[in-house]
Amino acid sequence: MKFVLLFGVLLVTLFSYSSAEMLDDFDQAVEDELLSLIEKEEARAKECTPRFYDCSHDRHSCCRSELFKDVCTCFYPEGGDNEVCTCQQPKHLKYMEKAADKAKKFGGKIKKWFG
């Protein structure tokens, strides 16, 4: 009986060790694949255009604000014939960000009072 028990423990130990090795190999392969994808993404990334800067060269290059991406807005200045494009935040998104910020601050106060 002792021999069967000892053999069973040895078998379980070897099985768990081999399955752990297989999982490590699998995790390493997944990690390598993910790193290669991230490197490709970083190489593709480009600089964004800050708010109120010229975005006529690439109208989709505006930076993100805290919650929303700025929009490239084009207009003709008064008395001018040239079109000017700048990255701006639409007013409704500006108000939504302010409301979200106030709600976050109010939630912090509530948590402080009752937490």
UniProtKB/Swiss-Prot annotation:
Gene Ontology cellular component terms for the protein in this record: extracellular region
Keyword set includes Amino-acid biosynthesis: no
Expression (tissue specificity): Expressed by the venom gland.
One Pfam family linked to the record: Toxin_35
Protein keywords: Disulfide bond, Knottin, Secreted, Signal, Toxin
Compartments in which it is found: Secreted
Cleaved signal peptide residues: 1-20
Cysteines joined through disulfide linkages: C48-C63, C55-C72, C62-C87, C74-C85
Coarse class of the protein's main subcellular location: secreted
Gene Ontology molecular functions: toxin activity
Domain writeup: The presence of a 'disulfide through disulfide knot' structurally defines this protein as a knottin.
Protein name in the entry: U3-lycotoxin-Ls1a
Organism ancestry: Eukaryota, Metazoa, Ecdysozoa, Arthropoda, Chelicerata
